[in-house]
């Protein structure tokens, strides 16, 4: 006999973002098991150089189609390449040009997966919900309260860092079936159900770059400007091929050889002098210039869409997969905050996102403007 929940779900249509990967495949399967009317939607977000071996779009679409056929659900396709170029890629290039290090995956979620996708699912496919294969969870409040976004159950795979721009309205319209599972369990389900994606490896790297070498890709769109590498005292110790290829705290790829009168400790990027096109490097992972006591962030997005008006104790991540850092948020205005860490941190990078948590709850975040 059908459960009450199963029967209520059968009136609801869910459009699943099918990427051709295991997480979205299992998401579609689980929603079908829960009784929803499930349809897939495959997005093509990148048009350039599809003839290169790096672009897996054709293979991904074939895998998504095979999974939908196996599950007996329709698959729609949509091309968001123009929206992606205008709203994600041009920002990505502008940030690199300005010497910052952006995170395009966060912008892709904001502008494409939870905006353009949601609008298309609403207007064309008449969706009640959309669903994605992200490792996050959400609450389902019964009494008119705003839903909250929670970290994924699998701490290793939690993707809330990439989704902090979502509003409670977007969270309310989205289901995250695999957020309640550990990754090995997701693969086990895919295998049990005979889904072609069960053993497919997870995609890595920025969506439009894929597996190729980042510097090669970037140089096609932004001309590199070589310059000097200096110590904080102004001593020239090497040359760089372009500031955009380097990020704060970076150790590899500096090609600074052994020098007289210097210790054997490795060199790290401590700063970028944009005016002079100079990279500043220091020796030793514990060098004080590598450490920040806090940061200033702007372009804030709070999941509940309520600005912070007084100091808040919470934790922050300044990059993906980082352990939580205890901190205090101090509001400077509705759209700017100062964040002071309990302990100094390395590699706090302007252009990256600072994302805030209270326990399991993702509060939101913003773009790092400067470090303190």
UniProtKB/Swiss-Prot annotation:
Annotated spans, Interaction with tRNA: 157-159, 319-320
Keyword Acetylation in record: no
MF-aspect GO terms: ATP binding; tRNA binding; tRNA-uridine 2-sulfurtransferase activity
GO cellular component: cytoplasm
Binding site for ATP: 17-24, 43, 133
Main function: Catalyzes the 2-thiolation of uridine at the wobble position (U34) of tRNA, leading to the formation of s(2)U34.
Matches recorded under HAMAP family: tRNA_thiouridyl_MnmA
Similarity annotation: Belongs to the MnmA/TRMU family.
Name of the featured protein: tRNA-specific 2-thiouridylase MnmA
UniProt gene name: mnmA
